[in-house]
């Protein structure tokens, strides 16, 4: 009987693997054909190279399907990646979060992986300067800074080889160039628009924000400001939508002068009538002096602006190259003022009402995650086969029970064993791994709520773990605790603090490639700036009110991945004769599993922090949990002895 069953399982797995291989080969051929079609377009237009951005006209991290051009062309599904195609080469440039994923997804497509932020690797601008003279790009999807880097590299290369008679270079702006190849390309999304009740859910009134921006404009001699980043516009106008998955944003542009505010946005309608939510929102906006214009009217709006103002302020890190070219058709180059948008910093410092809502939101989010972890451990312990996908869906279901839930803040990362070695593992609906009662399971997830945005990662021992898994688990946790305990002088940047999270790993000659921390929006994007905690230099100091992730990790290809992530609030920590001091308050409220911990590797201070944190989680969440989950959590949060 057992032998027959094993043979049946073996044959079933063999068939599944064969089908998977055949499907991969079929898709690889499709992507190869698309690249060849693009080369045909290049030949007809005399382009040496085409560069394709993984972003959209608003520099979004998560573009809507219409702008997922990298995915359509190559099959790569990571959130960060740009493609270069020449007549004899196709390459994808992405960072360490996606190296393993890219190697798998690009197999057979003819697209070569180029690693970014790795010593010795050539970035796109330099590569283009060495391999092309005429470069075409969709200017709608490349920001001004990125295009200037390409132009600068190509110009420098031209100067170097001028004596050899090298031809002049050119960067061709070809908006929506993929329309010629992508027959069923999606349209720009249009979803209902809602406004936020800040009296109920925290924040600052729209009129106050607009008044603040106008004061900033007066102080900085800016007659007009063009905002193109969707989260900045959503924050300033207190509007939300669902044009982009996981991000409550509305695709739009915004012009602000001392005389008017014009919002360029697509208007969702049915049978010629606005949907009720949008109609009410537009009425409210109009009452606050916001003029509603059609999205595509941005071009005429910029032309009108040229007749009304002598200059305009823009942020070249988010303004797309095509719109910039249109601005230059209206304004002299010296009248287009580049700078960092003031909205980015103002948005990152949460108000007292937002902070209070966030504290409660992280408690409610913690209840959902604890219920999920209890369910998962119980199911796996009873011998039931729970797949990564089922686990992910169950976690989402627990979150969906929370009042004010508006969806996930990003795609759940539900990864068991080797899958967790991919920092941004994409859990497949079909064929995802079964979670076994041994080793490590990593779950990185978050929710969008009217009262804030959450993000949390827990690495969970599902049963017996190897000595290496335990050591890695403990070293990563030491780094997270070190950063959590940090006290630092005002003016400190995340660049200064990053080493705290890495030092325990570095001492063991281990490391991780991604950043340690990113800013988090308030019912906005789960990734925001200007602050960050990473080894790359960022001049932005951490300020009281900023909410940032604390998430060191460690990844061993083919074995396991570990990441511990809490969200921390920067707050004041008093003063001394040496100045003003800051510290972190941990907002995340979910226990840290200690069953894979090596206590002897933790200092007494680290153990004290861990025990105090777990006790806080238990005392806060136990009254809100079902009785069986509360009993389970009591066992999970018992103090660890050294």
Model segments located where?
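The N-terminal extracellular segments of secreted preproproteins, especially immediately downstream
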Residues: 1, 15-18
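Active-site neighborhoods and metal-handling regions in enzymes and metal-associated proteins
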Residues: 10, 17-642
């Amino acid at each position: 009987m057992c032998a027959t069953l094993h043979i049946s399982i073996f044959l079933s797995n063999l068939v599944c693997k064969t089908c998977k291989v055949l499907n991969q080969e079929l898709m690889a051929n499709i992507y190869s054909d698309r690249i060849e079609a693009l080369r045909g377009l290049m030949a007809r237009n005399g382009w040496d190279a085409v560069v394709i951005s993984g972003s959209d006209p608003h520099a979004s991290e998560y573009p809507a399907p219409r702008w997922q051009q990298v995915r359509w062309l190559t099959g790569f599904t990571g959130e960060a990646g740009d493609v270069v195609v020449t007549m004899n080469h196709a390459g994808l440039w992405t960072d360490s979060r996606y190296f393993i994923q890219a190697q798998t997804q690009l197999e057979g497509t003819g697209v070569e992986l180029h690693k970014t932020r790795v010593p010795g690797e050539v970035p796109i601008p330099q590569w283009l300067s060495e391999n092309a003279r005429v470069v075409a790009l969709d200017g709608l999807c490349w920001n001004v800074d990125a295009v200037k880097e390409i132009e600068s590299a190509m110009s420098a290369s031209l100067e170097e080889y001028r004596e050899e008679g090298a031809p002049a270079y050119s960067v061709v702006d070809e908006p929506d160039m993929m329309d010629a190849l992508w027959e069923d390309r999606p349209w720009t999304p249009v979803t209902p628009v809602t406004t936020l009740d800040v009296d109920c859910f925290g924040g600052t009134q729209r009129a106050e924000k607009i008044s603040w921006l106008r004061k900033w404009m007066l102080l900085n001699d800016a007659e007009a400001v063009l905002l193109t980043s969707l989260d900045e516009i959503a924050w300033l106008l207190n509007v939300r939508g669902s044009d982009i998955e996981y991000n409550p944003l509305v695709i739009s542009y915004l012009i602000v002068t001392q005389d008017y505010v014009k919002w360029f946005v697509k208007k969702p309608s049915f049978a010629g009538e606005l949907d009720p939510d949008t109609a009410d929102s537009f009425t409210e906006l109009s009452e606050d002096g916001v003029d509603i214009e059609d999205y595509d009217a941005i071009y005429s709006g910029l032309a009108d602006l040229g007749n009304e103002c002598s200059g305009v302020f823009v942020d070249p890190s988010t303004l797309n190259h095509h719109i910039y070219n249109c601005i230059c058709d209206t304004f002299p180059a010296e009248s287009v003022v580049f700078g960092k948008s003031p909205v980015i910093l103002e948005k990152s410092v949460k108000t007292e009402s937002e902070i209070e809502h966030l504290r409660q939101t992280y408690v409610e989010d913690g209840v959902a995650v604890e219920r999920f972890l209890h369910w998962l451990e119980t199911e796996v312990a009873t011998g039931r086969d729970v797949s990564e996908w089922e686990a992910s869906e169950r976690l989402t279901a627990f979150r969906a029970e929370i009042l004010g839930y508006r969806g996930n803040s990003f795609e759940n990362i539900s990864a068991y064993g080797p899958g967790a070695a991919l920092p941004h593992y994409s859990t497949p609906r079909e064929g995802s791994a079964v979670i076994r009662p041994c080793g490590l399971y990593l779950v990185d997830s978050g929710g969008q709520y009217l009262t804030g945005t959450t993000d949390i990662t827990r690495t969970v021992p599902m049963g017996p773990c190897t000595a290496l898994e335990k050591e890695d688990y403990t070293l990563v946790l030491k780094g997270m605790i070190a950063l959590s305990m940090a006290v630092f002088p005002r003016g400190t940047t995340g660049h200064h603090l990053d080493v705290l999270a890495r030092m325990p790993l570095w001492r063991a000659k281990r490391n991780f490639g991604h950043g340690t921390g990113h800013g988090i929006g308030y019912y906005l994007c789960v990734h925001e700036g200007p602050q960050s905690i990473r080894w790359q230099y960022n001049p932005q100091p951490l300020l009281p009110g900023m909410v940032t992730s604390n998430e060191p990790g460690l990844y061993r290809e083919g074995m396991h991945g570990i990441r511990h992530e809490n969200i921390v609030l920067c707050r004041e920590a008093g003063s001394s004769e040496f100045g003003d001091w800051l510290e972190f308050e941990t907002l995340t409220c979910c226990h840290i599993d200690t069953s894979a911990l090596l206590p002897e590797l933790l200092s007494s201070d680290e153990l004290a922090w861990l025990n105090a944190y777990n006790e806080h989680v238990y005392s806060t969440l136990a009254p809100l949990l079902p009785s069986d989950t509360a009993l389970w959590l009591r066992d999970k949060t018992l103090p660890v002895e050294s």
